[in-house]
Curated annotation (Swiss-Prot):
UniProt topological domain (Virion surface) ranges: 1-22
Positions annotated as glycosylated: N20
Gene Ontology CC: host cell plasma membrane; membrane; virion membrane
Positions of post-translational Phosphoserine modification: S64, S82
One BP annotation, GO: protein complex oligomerization
Protein's name according to its UniProt entry: Matrix protein 2
Gene name of the record: M
Signal peptide, first to last residue: none
Main localization of the protein described in the UniProt heading: virion
Organism listed in the record: Influenza A virus (strain A/Swine/Wisconsin/1/1961 H1N1)
MF annotations from Gene Ontology: monoatomic ion channel activity; proton transmembrane transporter activity
Length: 97
């Protein structure tokens, strides 16, 4: 006798979802949260460049200069510019033969 004949296989009627008739609020809340999560994930994947670019560059502002004398502001600008100038020296030109 084969083991396959003794294995109980579910009938087609048992494969259906049994939670369709359920009025449990937890099931409804989980379904709503799942659908919202899916929608947000799709939007994130579609617009991630716009969203994260906005966060990275759009929301960045320099430190507040309110109440700071103009001479100190100019000194700060010069330091920032010199830092940028130093970074420009790190680029390496590679020429292929």
């Amino acid at each position: 006798m084969s083991l396959l004949t003794e294995v109980e296989t579910p009938t087609r009627s048992e494969w259906g979802c049994r939670c369709n008739d359920s009025s449990d609020p937890l099931v409804a809340a989980a379904s709503i949260i799942g659908i919202l999560h899916l929608i947000l994930w799709i939007l994130d994947r579609l617009f991630f460049k716009c969203i994260y670019r906005r966060f990275k560059y759009g929301l960045k502002r320099g430190p507040s200069t309110e109440g700071v004398p103009e001479s100190m502001r100019e000194e700060y600008r010069q330091k920032q510019q010199s830092a940028v100038d130093v970074d420009d020296g790190h680029f390496v030109n590679i020429e292929l033969e």
